[in-house]
Amino acid sequence: MRIAPLLALALLAAAPAAAQQATYTNPILYADYSDPDLIRVGDEYFMVASSFHFSPGIPVLKSRDLVHWSIVGHVLPRLPFGPLFDMPGPHTLDDTISRPTGGTKYAGGVWAPSIRHHDGKFFVYWATPDEGVFMATATDPAGPWSEAVHVIAAPGLEDPCPFWDDDGTAWLIHGRVGAGPLILHRMSADGKRSLDDGIVVAEDKEKLPVLEGPKLYKRNGWYYIFAPIGGVERGPQAVGRARDIRGPYDWRTVLEPGTTPIQGPHQGGWVETPSGQGWFAHFNSTGAFGRIVHLQPLLWQGDNWPVVGKPVPGQNYGQPVASHAMPDTGNAPTTDRLQDSDEFASAQLGLQWSWNHNPLDGAWSLAERPGWLRLEAQPAQHLVTARNTLTQIMQGPRPSFTTRLDVARMAEGQRAGLTLFGVRPSWIGVVREGGRNRIVLASEGVETVGPELAGQTVELRAEVSESQSVRYSYSQDGSTFTPFGDPIWLARFSWWKGSRPALFSFTRGASGTADFDWFRVERREP
């Protein structure tokens, strides 16, 4: 007689759980992890993204639920591609000119890496636009990674992706700088050498304009090339398929902006969960926040074509979802998050940090003053030509960055502070001139002098708005912050990257040091 009441209680208990099915909201990473690619190994997921001229290169992210990610390592401890990655000069740019013609490698470095797992090892491939195609391997995605291997030594290549067929044959697909044709090569079984000059497998300037970023897969006997078309700002995602890996490929658009505000939802990677769900991670260009990462469901139709996002009635493509049920990964949703704040209490920098170009290792330290980051100023006339600017990827949409600076060891002509780094950067900091330390606000190379610093420490803050402007302020007592100047618009395009919060020190005179106690990030609510 108690069966019915017990069943009713069980149903009541289950109802809220069903009604409260976990969901996620796009973007999953409001951060500039451009050209993302991802894989699943076991019940874990790994992602890589473009890092361009920042060092260490190629961040490796990890997730258990496909939505929450953290950084676990980098493929490249330094950028080994040539001396210009050490910013030797002579420099032809300044804080108002964005396109260098020598002395640096802005916009060079790592373009559009791919990650795969084969024969018990992780493989990452990438191109540098002036040097060619490279790869590295590791047994643990957190590292250590092997030294970079030059797979194809030729300029003008981009966006490589390896593929091992069922019989072990290794292939490599890539594009050309300028969104040229997609080219397929045979590779040695270990993936370290291209065995031929390659064949063009896709090129159609009218139907497939700006074809780039290919990812090569196989499913149900079909070979698939996932590739964006139409350009970064507005292009859709296309897929080509063929029975023979060499083609010919038939092409179809699988993800369009549709009626959503998400323009240019493309370039990324496909992954399946253990339950067979398909998911596609891609970027969306946002200006100063860079190319942020969205996650779309991917559904395979009965005709073996994929549709990405929410299917559009009567069409062969989908459109981006704003929110969706969490992926069925078999894992509970996590609370993992991208690292940001740093108290500089460790013997090593946090994984969230990367230098503008390769650092001068003898000119920075976490050991000389334990608990502080010390930057020894190197000669430079402009922030964009200064060595050892320490950056991290900005996480939107309303971040605030605060640091404490000790100026006691600064020298005449030295500058140090907090910047939103990019093309035509702005910064707030301290300049020592005439034996005095003054708070200064700079924008596009123009310095506005503020009050003299009363003590030897000052807290500096940068608050970024969702509309992509920054407001700087400072505090001499650690509690009351005084705004300095009007909001400054951030550059919407900075050498293929978004604007980045960064700590810096350089000198137009003598060489001193700047000490930073901590760097704290607050993600502000609307």
Task: Indicate residue ranges for each PLM-predicted region.
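Carbohydrate-active catalytic/glycan-binding domains of CAZyme proteins
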Residues: 19-526
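Bacterial N-terminal signal peptides
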Residues: 4-14
